């Protein structure tokens, strides 16, 4: 197990300050979400959770090492309210879950210096806490504190279905990367539901959450279509097989609530686990710890794996830090005799 944290990547000294048009002058303190694009560009979502107004913003950095310095972003835009969650839609679309109760779709212009609004729909009655794009890329699912889950047609900008299968606010939804009609949801009603929108009764309960500990985060295994992981408010991470609806593995990873789970794109994927205990843990397929970082000084809110460097994992948190971690992808060598360099 590796516990030391490498220093953050240092941006090059020679870089020109050039705030793009329409970008806000200042980024909000709390960083809520981060997503790499396939070319390595980094998208950030920020929120201000103090003061009289809960503002938010979106930022694109072609050079991730420059984040979160506003003057080195490629594009930025102010949002009406805080950004609770976001995800890429293709290479230029950005789907946002807003504190205002709206689901928003933004798009980069051709030069990628402007982020323009495509739609902003107030279909939820409370904060939209989570969004996920279905594998087809044309539909998405949103979950809210209003207890509702909604399936969207992004091209038509309409809600296709609205469900109230949970009895408390929805904390996470996760679209299957393998099947375009399947997704997961979890809620403060202590239930995890498996959805298939092709069925007359689309939701079925996965009876694997621990009594008394609410599930908070979900992630599908990138290669095994019937397997997913979830984290709970107690800091435990569990691996579930939907065929047996039982926990295959479970591990007490954190001392506080799990805030996010993100699989790597490796051939043998690693799992990044984030928590309100301000730590990041990287786990192997048996949920054993490979790497841990406590570089953040507040809640760690999101993580994203670089598509260009499989060792690079980037995290963001409420301390306004963007931390770049180098995670060992090969087993560490056994300690040998010390060598002397002349």
UniProtKB/Swiss-Prot annotation:
It holds the Pfam family WD40. SMART domains: WD40. Keywords: Cytoplasm, Nucleus, Phosphoprotein, Repeat, WD repeat. WD repeats lie at residues 22-75, 78-116, 123-162, 165-205, 209-250, 253-293, 295-330. One of its GO terms (cellular component) is cytoplasm. GO terms for biological process: oocyte axis specification. One of its GO terms (molecular function) is methyl-CpG binding. InterPro entries: Methylosome_Comp_WDR77, WD40/YVTN_repeat-like_dom_sf, WD40_repeat_CS, WD40_repeat_dom_sf, WD40_rpt. The keyword Nucleus applies. Its main location: nucleus. Gene3D superfamilies: YVTN repeat-like/Quinoprotein amine dehydrogenase. It is found in: Nucleus; Cytoplasm. The modification Phosphothreonine is found at residue 5. Component of the methylosome complex composed of PRMT5, WDR77 and CLNS1A. Found in a complex composed of PRMT5, WDR77 and RIOK1. RIOK1 and CLNS1A bound directly to PRMT5 at the same binding site, in a mutually exclusive manner, which allows the recruitment of distinct methylation substrates, such as nucleolin/NCL and Sm proteins, respectively. Found in a complex with the component of the methylosome, PRMT5, CLNS1A, WDR77, PRMT1 and ERH. Directly interacts with PRMT5, as well as with several Sm proteins, including SNRPB and SNRPD2 and, more weakly, SNRPD3 and SNRPE. Non-catalytic component of the methylosome complex, composed of PRMT5, WDR77 and CLNS1A, which modifies specific arginines to dimethylarginines in several spliceosomal Sm proteins and histones. This modification targets Sm proteins to the survival of motor neurons (SMN) complex for assembly into small nuclear ribonucleoprotein core particles. Might play a role in transcription regulation. This is Methylosome protein WDR77.
């Amino acid at each position: 197990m590796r516990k030391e944290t490498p220093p953050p990547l240092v941006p090059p000294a020679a870089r020109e300050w050039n705030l793009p048009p329409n970008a806000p002058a200042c980024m909000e303190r709390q960083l809520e979400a981060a997503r790499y694009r396939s070319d390595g560009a980094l998208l950030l979502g920020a929120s201000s959770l103090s003061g009289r107004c809960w503002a938010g913003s979106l930022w694109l950095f072609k050079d991730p090492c420059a984040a979160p310095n506003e003057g080195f972003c490629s594009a930025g835009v102010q949002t009406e309210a805080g950004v609770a969650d976001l995800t890429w839609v293709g290479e230029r679309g950005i789907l946002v879950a807003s504190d205002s109760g709206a689901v928003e779709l933004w798009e980069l212009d051709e030069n990628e210096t402007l982020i323009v609004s495509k739609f902003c729909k107030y279909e939820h009655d409370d904060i939209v806490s989570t969004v996920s794009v279905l594998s087809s890329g044309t539909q998405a699912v949103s979950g809210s504190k209003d207890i509702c889950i909604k399936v969207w047609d992004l091209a038509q900008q309409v809600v296709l279905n609205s469900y109230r299968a949970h009895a408390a606010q929805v904390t996470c939804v996760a679209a299957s990367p393998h099947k375009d009609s399947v997704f997961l949801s979890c809620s403060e009603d202590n239930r995890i539901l498996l959805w298939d929108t092709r069925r007359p009764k689309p939701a079925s309960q996965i009876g694997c959450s621990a009594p008394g500990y609410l599930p908070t985060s979900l992630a599908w295994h990138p290669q095994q279509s019937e397997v997913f992981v979830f984290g709970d408010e107690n800091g435990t991470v569990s691996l579930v097989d939907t065929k047996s609806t039982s926990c295959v593995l479970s591990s007490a990873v954190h001392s506080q609530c799990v805030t996010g789970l993100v699989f790597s794109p490796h051939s043998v994927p690693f799992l990044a686990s984030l928590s309100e205990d301000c730590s990041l843990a990287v786990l192997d397929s048996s949920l054993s710890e490979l790497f841990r970082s406590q570089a953040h000084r507040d809640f760690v809110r999101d993580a994203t794996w670089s598509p260009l460097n499989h060792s690079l994992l980037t995290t963001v948190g409420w301390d306004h830090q963007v931390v770049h971690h180098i995670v060992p992808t090969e087993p560490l060598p056994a300690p040998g005799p010390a060598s002397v360099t002349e």
